[in-house]
């Protein structure tokens, strides 16, 4: 807990200062079953007392406002208000930057108070007895503080900061000694089970962070099993990275994830910018003097001048389009000299003797480059040239913005897009280079350590042949891995960078001579840089300059403390580094000039540098021996682009030297999103390099999002989920995601099902498996990007519904087992019916709105040659239209909930500049928690009318449709048919005639449907072209019959009943309307006009939506189509003319919810039209039919324009009140006002919220309220709430790339021209997946094959040894197969028939001239829909973090002394048939007994009317269909391969209801008070609790007192489990609530009274009297069930304490907190308490309160018990 260097006396004094007294030890062998209630109280008191945790309040200027007594004891500062004020900076040791660490943190919190900030700092402890005058490190204490910003309760202005301070837990940094012993530094871990000591190099441990602990366990396993042969190594546990979809060893996942998500976000940004450039090029291609640009008229008088400008811009745009990201290439020359057999290090004069006959790389020379550090990323010559052209482009035309604003804006926008793309491409290159260096360094360390351990085992067997397990063997430390040059200069260490050394100051790093696998030294180019203010504001996760003392930037990841779920570095590593365009790009290959380096130098982008290291004396200073170095990591930031001149740019991320990474200062950081403007980086020699060094820091800062943010909110209820069956070894999808721009180093058999998507490799010596199979390949090859999403990645399970343009299907992702709803849209239909803009609109809005709670999330989008695919969140509750149809109408309580959620969602959209235009019950989905989510944004923003019936003028045809195909000026996109052999985005790889702008398909489609007219009958749900009418009405996905035919007892007239042909179609279809065929046959391409129209005119998303440049680029993509307006908008936008009886305009779609202004063509940009639709929906919710419904659209239009609402006829007023309250009727009437200016909501959302109907609605927590109706989901594949509407499974066609698959690889994916090469004698690889297959085949299961038509089932179990793995074998190329792991731990492996040893390295034998260059998705043929590739990286990143959290929890739970029954089993229970059991033994009875009597509803609003049915525990935050949940343990564990608690059993006999209509029993309302409970985060608290246990128990210097306390915590946990088990079988009439309650009451009599009352109710109470004690108990690691506190506490405010507890990751961050106060109003308005009790507290009130939370806890306990029992059965 404190610095290891503390003396025993000092340590004891410190413990006494903290109040840690010696406690009598607890017997470890006591029987928990014999413990009484008093014993439980004793252990609970012991577990929570004397927690060394302090409270510190600081003014905004750093003055100490309040400190706990413990703080005063440690610092020696007297708590005397009369003394002079104490500033925190005066107490902190270190430099000025160290002293200002709290001020920096305060500034961060002031800019973003939604985060909590964690700081580590050092102080000098107060003089203790015997230590007076001592100035050594024994008096220095390292503390950690986590704090938040507190605002004044009245003014809401920042008031002060509050911090929880505690001694820092033992960390990697705690083991740092002084500088003099730096080279010999090791990390020593001790296992409590066998007490085996393992030592890791410091820098290696810092790089892995938490993963180092897992790797130590692997080394211990090697030692325990006495492995002496590389071929017998145990199989490491693997985990799936959700971002790149590669399996990585668990110890590498956390570090890998940081760089992986950074790279993919940059890739996504590049793709969006590339698409925008294509749009811009289309504008330039058809630009004329008479054109407008973004509303500005072009004012130039000379056509020649305009043409010169446009030609220059087109050339610039083309150069930017043809820029591709870099590719990895091997440095073949140096790769031969860097391997062990060369006995040397190229960077120094020391040679190592090769005395190891088992040298890893000697056995498999084909794989040498896999671990070589000399491979690097390189741009093609053409890309280099284009980068230079873009960065040096200067306009030759001097335009004054005032003279010609339109043309000036066009030039600015084009140049800005081009430079942004260059910037992003360079940034991606930096990120990939950085990742490669880290991976290679770690891989080398792993090889070294494993081989050293094997050598130790061999030596132990030789020296101790009779006693292999003697302690003398296991306590033999590993030979230390340290530098061979003791005079070496200071090393710069970082958790995110490889070893680096400063020129003439930093020494080369070598491995021990016996290992022969040294980490290659990384020389740092000396660049003199002066940090500016902008440098400080824009941190980089990478260091930028070396220091004259040891710099450790950032501080190593510390062991997870009791309040943290993720490491701070990982939570805040979302920054995408932002290098400038004129970055220093230097490539050093030991003076070997390569094409990239020379080309870069030639173009002036950078110069190659050679900064080799030399030996020099180590400087020593007292300051260099102290403390933890600085780490400043900011939360996620927007990507911004610098617009400063090139001369003012410098690289913010990395040196372009591919052998070095320039350290960059990441200190003195403030959160900001503006761009960096740094001083010029001047190249200097080593003698001048010290001028720019920074002092080392002894403080660190990290930011953690507060509770409720995506980073860690609601983790609890995710804790037990698992996938059902998933592919252990997966079908590889297309090469990369969201597009490909790197080589795929896999051989053909590694992608058996998608061989056409796998490019041949350019390097004959470099192959890398996509899935590492051992600890030696820790990182996946960063050049093998995640696959492009494809429909082949999913198992299509069943259709959900069918619409006009396509269908929606329930699908399960093969790799992860997650469930999604995939909307499939036929391109031909979308193009013919002018729905291109609608599709783009929906996709773009869902992308930017994906994190909104009211929007169905979009996880991915992609396309093939025939279809568009939108992968969305599967919401199993169906839509409101189905609910209304099944129930007739809804009770007022239900309707109010849905209406409030709709109002919140619509208002938020309006604030973000989005108008939905198509709100209706079919577009409102119900999630599994019962809340409403909006979908179908196809008509949003651009408006219904313009797309519905706009017949453009001849001169305003689509830009794209008017481009002549054979015009070279327009050739900017390559034809589909020529996309195989060329790198699509590299112009030098193909001729201009290959880049035809393919628009022929659109023209032909336009002609095909030009004379067609459509109709639909009541018997057909598909469109049938007929010449009889031009009206088409699409049926609903869900309404199979008249909605009024439900169980409503309102006698509706026949005119109000809908016929089948008049029902609207589903919400899940993209659009409910489309443009009719154009009447003018001469305009064959006219129907394409809207493909290039924007979603709205002169509107953009608000800035608060755009959290990053990726989203900004999305916004640009949305609106860039409207950059040019070629003609005025048509004036005739009306849909209906009441006075024109001869009109031939027909409407198709759903007219019932259209506003009058929309019908008249006036309301396209008027958001009031949405409020009209809300009024119609509300009417229908309460009464069961739309207010203006009629038999024909024309009749509907007439009624809407008249504004006459069709109220039902009631017998009397009393009957009317049963269905419609006066407030509800008034609200409907005010929303359905014909005049938009007088309609409710015209003056703002507040007038809607203030309506009497919404009285007592908490608008800030609408989506947090308990839903009235929660769908009953019996199976994750349940689709009972949906109508099929005739939807059927179908073949979705091949991917676009597959059309060209046979050109190189023939019919079966193998090049027939070189098939004779397959007979080469190539040794077969050891198949890691086959090993798994053998293990999995030990259990009986039903084999499942993949969806791959080219694959066949094989059982490889007999061909591979079990649990045997060679270090050398893992460096071989590994075939990529597909396989499933079934729920009971069994599985099969499906592999390609061409998986033959003879074909293992076939691609290596293909002659270079016959190999494809990898095809970049940047320039795949741009169809009408653009690239259409999207992946929700935020969700994937969250899934990775959840997986890391789960791994940490599992690791801690395995530690001794921690009793924990929970595991990562699925919340779906353990039933083998996949069904879900309701908690309790009478689950079936409660389910069957809860059927609503729909045929005789009595709508009175009374809860008892609808029964008392307990909800199932399938909540939205824990349900198995929730995608990317943290519990989806996609891992490969050598010890436990079975999937515990899978979602669905292997038999899967219990399937969803096959009927087309939802079953009536699904609709149940848990309105009884006994069932209005929510699932809280019990499992999260348990996980945090377990982590806090193991953190402290792992401390080797743990005090006896602390051990006693931790044993008590463990005992409390064990007893709590027993009490929970007892409650499960106890009688429901039992009075005792068995709650653990923490009470804080400063007045003793009140504290005594509340404590006694709670104890009488059966609670176990821990009572305290001050805020300090409250914080200490609440952060002790014990999770309480309820916390009760007085509002007014001495010195501290309860509101501030509650905010601190809830907004930091603690064991009680989710515990309900109740205020007991006389100030009821103040407590209630603070909105931080879960409940408020007014003094004096009566026993009845207290009993109701406890019963309320006990009921919630009981439900959690039942779930936990079911899941725990499920774990034990497995």
UniProtKB/Swiss-Prot annotation:
Source organism (scientific name): Saccharomyces cerevisiae (strain ATCC 204508 / S288c)
EC number: 2.7.11.1
Coiled-coil intervals, chain numbering: none
Binding sites annotated in the UniProt record for ATP: 800-808, 823
Self-association and partners: Interacts with the cyclin-dependent kinase (CDK) PHO85 and IGO1.
Gene this protein is translated from: RIM15
Catalytic center residues: 918
Domain (AGC-kinase C-terminal): residue spans on this chain: 1255-1320
Protein name: Serine/threonine-protein kinase RIM15
